[in-house]
Amino acid sequence: MISKEQKQKIITEFGKNPNDTGSVEVQIALITDRIRYLTEHLRSNKKDHSSKRGLLKLVGQRRNLLRYYQKKNLEAYRTLIAKLGLRK
């Protein structure tokens, strides 16, 4: 799981202020971090089907948020994708 310190670091990096947890950028960054954690977990635990299902749900949630953000603000979307290192 993501530690509190790591979560706070992501919030301060992507948020507008240190308490900004609801903005789209922060949500996408936090979900991306959880996806990376679960991907590593599933590499060593191949038969953990409940975690795999959770990973697929997170990927879908992130995809929906990215689609919304792309429609809302294309330039900021592109910078966010580059910052997170996502392929788009």
UniProtKB/Swiss-Prot annotation:
Ribosomal protein keyword on record: yes
Highest taxon above the source species: Bacteria
Pfam family, any one: Ribosomal_S15
Coiled coil (residue ranges): none
One of the GO biological process terms: translation
Any one annotated GO CC term: cytosolic small ribosomal subunit
GO MF annotation terms: rRNA binding; structural constituent of ribosome
Assigned keywords, A-Z: Ribonucleoprotein, Ribosomal protein, RNA-binding, rRNA-binding
Gene3D superfamilies: 6.10.250.3130, S15/NS1, RNA-binding (1.10.287.10)
Family statement: Belongs to the universal ribosomal protein uS15 family.
Description of how the protein assembles with itself and partners: Part of the 30S ribosomal subunit. Forms a bridge to the 50S subunit in the 70S ribosome, contacting the 23S rRNA.
Reported function: One of the primary rRNA binding proteins, it binds directly to 16S rRNA where it helps nucleate assembly of the platform of the 30S subunit by binding and bridging several RNA helices of the 16S rRNA.
Protein name: Small ribosomal subunit protein uS15
Species lineage: Bacteria, Pseudomonadati, Spirochaetota, Spirochaetia, Spirochaetales
